[in-house]
Amino acid sequence: MFTAVIEKLLFLSTRKGKWVYAALLLAVVFCAYQMRLITIDTDPENMLEANHPARVFHNDVKHTFAMHDAIVVGVIASPANDTATDNAALSTNKGIYTPNNLQAIDGVTQQILNTEGVIARDVMSFSTVDNITQGDDGELKFSWMMSQAPSSQEEADYIANAIARLPMLQGSLASSSHNAAAIYVPIKDKNESFRIAEDIRAYIGANTTNETLQWHITGLPVAEDQFGVEMFIQMAISAPAAGLMIFILLFVFFRNFTLITAPMVVAMATVIITMGALIGLGFTVHIMSSMIAIFLMPIAVVDSVHILSEFSDRYKPGQKADQVITTVVEHLFQPMLFTSLTSAAGFYSLMLTPIPPVQIFGAFIGSGILLAFAITLTFIPAYISRMSPEALAKLQSALHADANTSSMKTTYLQRFVYGIRTLALNYKGALLVAFMVISAVSVWGIFQIQINDNPVRWFKENHEIRVADKALNKEFAGTYNAYIVIEDTRKLKSAGEILLSAELPPSLDEWRETTLDTLNNENAGNNFETLAFAVDDALFGDLESDEYDALNRLLSSIDEIKGTSKTFQQPDNVALLSDLQNYLSTQTLVGKTQSLSDVIKVVNRELHSGNDSDYELPNTQPAIAQTLLQYQSSHRPQDLWHFVTPDYRKTLVWLQLSSGDNQDMTEVIELVDNYFAQHTLPDGLTYQWAGKAYLNVVWQDNMVAGMLDSLLSAFIIVFVMMVLLLRSLIFGVLAMLPLTITITFIYGAIGIVGKDYDMPIAVLSALTLGLSVDFAIHFLARAKEIYKQTGSVSKTFDAMFEEPASAITRNALVIALGFTPLLLAPLVPYITVGIFLASIMFISALVTLLVLPAAMTLLKRWVFKEA
């Protein structure tokens, strides 16, 4: 069946080449037109399904507590005398607290408040927060911390002292060193964070002339959005740069521009059609899908290079190009089909992961591989068959020149292949032992792998985002956020149930029914306040003594239930928050925590003496309720609802972390789990995590588990395919040998050198599987074919280290060196992909050429019997 299909395709390609050109051009133009619809997505939230429990809860928490994604603008004041070491000199350093510095901060704050997309009422800065003090008559006093920029040092010192008295601001809004201040900028849409950050940078650049101030902007939203902007630019640079490098390398090998144009057309058409289809079908371009072009480029030219290599060797002047190319493609069809199917299977296995962007990446790369195979099978024969005799003559003069005039590249390639041949055929036993040792060490290295990621680390160390992240996390408690949400899950009796169960005299039955109707009215709402008002109204009526007493008892029980239902106004429960914070304050990974207890302590202090001795929690529910009621008379009453819900049954503890590494967040989660294991929450209280730092841990855990399942599944699928396609169990095992060694070595090296296992590295396993098996299939298929012709094992290997080994080496070099431009990328994931792509290609080719001959010789009784 395959023979008939390939014959028809080759007839169409060589006889109706213009049809092939027209069809390919139409597909490319149509898909290229779809790219105008591109949407960039760098939100790590989308690494989880929209209905994933952790993501749903995180978004519920943001809505419930009015928490918004925020940009952090930080400013650091250079010390007045960097070389000063004596105490007197240091004491004169006011740091950020000078009139000029505070005026600059106020100016930037006012600009931020007027920036489109900023939630102005929630901006936190010296200019927008309250100073909580005790008035002259002992009353609680709320005044703006910095209603206007100070004009004297005395006023600046007052602000410094005021902030030092407010633990909720110290370490968050101002550093304990007095050298830095922060502005927290909540935004309506995290996708606007880069634009807002750029507006702020532009204002600072144009309006702040104070050279002693260093301004920084960071935060996960701006890091993610800025990565998206730079990723878009990188997409436009990396793929063409890689294509250019591949083009140059192909010319070095084939010395014919006309000939090597063909594989480049295949690669570019594959990339454009695949990316156009992805965008046209409505998928966003995530960090992974942005690399589709980079991954497809090498795979798309692999088959073309094999065809060109064999065509160049077979074609002689005077022969018909269409006949030669037909023979070549028929000869290579089976190994090319096998490699395409197995490579596609490797990437399709990524669809088994629970990470949507990785699923999309795997689906489109797998489809792109099959598309490249189809284009290669039709376009390359059409192209070569239409080459002019003059162009083919030039090809021959370049490739079949006399040995004395051979090009340097041929000499180097032949020397390399000859060296590999010598090693492979003369040191079989030593090679097998060496690779066994390397594999054993690599397995140990795999167990040393540290799973970790951090979107900020996607930038190079000298990038402004990384510089800002390092500087601000050194000065402040932390720019990374996580939330512990504690909730009372006990079901409360409704107001209607309380009324129904109340012991009332029969004379109040009619009143009870009327009140129940009111409570059941959807407009009135079923709540205790409505019931309390109804009882109050009834008490003012003309009542008998038993009616009056019964209603009074009901009102008392309502008041009692209202008090006890407000879980986080109960002293023990608020103390629970304080105890948790005290524990976390002893952990180096946690910079600072804030909760409802901090609000209560500050207000309680100022309601009493104003001294630190009264910075404590009241010991009764009414006293706590009073402090919270007083706080709501501040300029920012909405801040209370960032920490507790209006019914006081759900509360939030805000953790500030100085590290956004998933590894560190995982350790914090374990610390809290251990704490609650030793300090059990009261019955009915439960806790859950939310926040960006936590979500990153969740999706990475999913990714690791998913990638392991994907890799194992793909390995089994490819092995079964190899056995079926090669029709031999022993050849199936041999085909998997280079793949297994390469994957083991690559990931072992990652563990040994201490490179974090992150998202780009995780998906490279699929590429390793696809490309490693490619070389092995070509080697085994050609070895079987040559053995059938020669009947001699030694002659088979001698022939294998001629054109087949040269083709494998040429392919490996083209792909490995073709991606060196990625090493110059400003974004770390692209650098990672470049390094590992090159390593995978080099190692898999080397293992194929060294290990397979040794293994085949060792097992020759079975291998060549089946051949």
Where are these regions (language model features)?
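Alpha-helical transmembrane helix bundles of large polytopic membrane transport and channel proteins
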Residues: 83-92, 100-174, 188, 193-196, ...
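Pore- and gate-forming transmembrane helices of large, multi-pass membrane proteins
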Residues: 235-237, 264, 316-353, 707, ...
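Transmembrane alpha-helices and their membrane-interface boundaries in multi-pass membrane transporters
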Residues: 22, 280, 297-309, 333-352, ...
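Interfacial segments of transmembrane alpha-helices in multi-pass membrane proteins
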Residues: 232-285, 352-356, 708-754, 758, ...
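Juxtamembrane segments of multi-pass membrane proteins
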Residues: 419-618
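Membrane-proximal extracytoplasmic
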Residues: 2-243
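Signature of alpha-helical transmembrane segments and their immediate interfacial
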Residues: 1-42, 381-382, 386, 397-454, ...
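Extracytoplasmic
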Residues: 149-256, 570-579, 583-589, 593, ...
